[in-house]
Amino acid sequence: MKKFLITLLLGVFMGLQASALTHQEINQAKVPVIYEENHLLPMGFIHLAFRGGGSLSDKNQLGLAKLFAQVLNEGTKELGAVGFAQLLEQKAISLNVDTSTEDLQITLEFLKEYEDEAITRLKELLKSPNFTQNALEKVKTQMLAALLQKESDFDYLAKLTLKQELFANTPLANAALGTKESIQKIKLDDLKQQFAKVFELNKLVVVLGGDLKIDQTLKRLNNALNFLPQGKAYEEPYFETSDKKSEKVLYKDTEQAFVYFGAPFKIKDLKQDLAKSKVMMFVLGGGFGSRLMEKIRVQEGLAYSVYIRSNFSKVAHFASGYLQTKLSTQTKSVALVKKIVKEFIEKGMTQQELDDAKKFLLGSEPLRNETISSRLNTTYNYFYLGLPLNFNQTLLNQIQKMSLKEINDFIKAHTEINDLTFAIVSNKKKDK
């Protein structure tokens, strides 16, 4: 799963209270709730993640999940987009609906004094969404305009092409925005069917944070959501990453080459190997001082930035990277990426590289979890991956104790990273 963003920052002090997990029964469904109370500021947020409500489930209606979420942002049928937005703004309430690859996500942010009203607005939206022809046509127009803009977004095109090469003939190869043809075919009945499919309580995960009394907040949520059916739990499909080492080039009117690349990264046990994968990818291509950055940018001057990172979700495990270079150095840059990765897999890293990686990761990881929003984001991600909620401390301990032999044995065991696929946006007339 891709991870959700909670924008509300409710404090910069660490460790005031660890995030915790409980369950709330709503209409006889046992809904997991991740929460953390923090009373520094009189603010709160509620995040609802409906598993299976993302673009992965679009099937032959590409763009439906995204369009559905955007129509939900058009307010209620009674008030419309403007009237509903004004009602929220009067009390400084923020209510936003979005999708990721796997989930539909509703984020509600509010001042403590308006918590009850915020949850009431949420209930009104779900009870009577603005499923009207006017709202549908408005969102269709917005999405078609976005698709038109994407035609000249070379990063988007290269990234989408890489997905299509790595996950050919699977839902992961599809564009979340859909196509012009698929968007135009979506009807009001499709939105109503999507609502019934997505909003089931057994697919729901709740995240709460801020100046809340959790028991009271959950009672209010129960009242807002208990009209939804139990439904069935979401079962994630898993997709293998291509190891065909293909190279796909799209020719456009561009002055630069946009190079995206990826490969399988077969991790069987995240609890044992997540720390090693973090160290491995940091040294290979995680920033300044990494192998890719030092050789491609510093020594060769071929790109301003280059990286590679791991991507672990319940639906796929793979590594992916990116660089942008001159058209004249495109071929050389691609060859150099292959060479650097191959040498790294064969020989591993040095003790100095391991020490530097430990210093950076052990110093930066705690900073990434110093706000309540970032802590809950991390906790939700661990919950999603099936890891303990407090896995962050385990991760830091594993990094601290990691030996050079341990990390190099791990690196040398993952020869599949050599099976790189490239997706490139270039210019046929100028790439020589």
UniProtKB/Swiss-Prot annotation:
It is found in: Secreted. Disulfide bonds: none annotated. SUPFAM superfamilies: LuxS/MPP-like metallohydrolase. InterPro entries: Metalloenz_LuxS/M16, MPP/UQCRC_Complex, Pept_M16_N, Peptidase_M16_C. Coiled coil: none annotated. It comes from the Bacteria. One of its GO terms (molecular function) is metal ion binding. May contribute to the full activity of the protease PqqE. This is Non-peptidase homolog YmxG. It comes from Helicobacter pylori (strain ATCC 700392 / 26695).
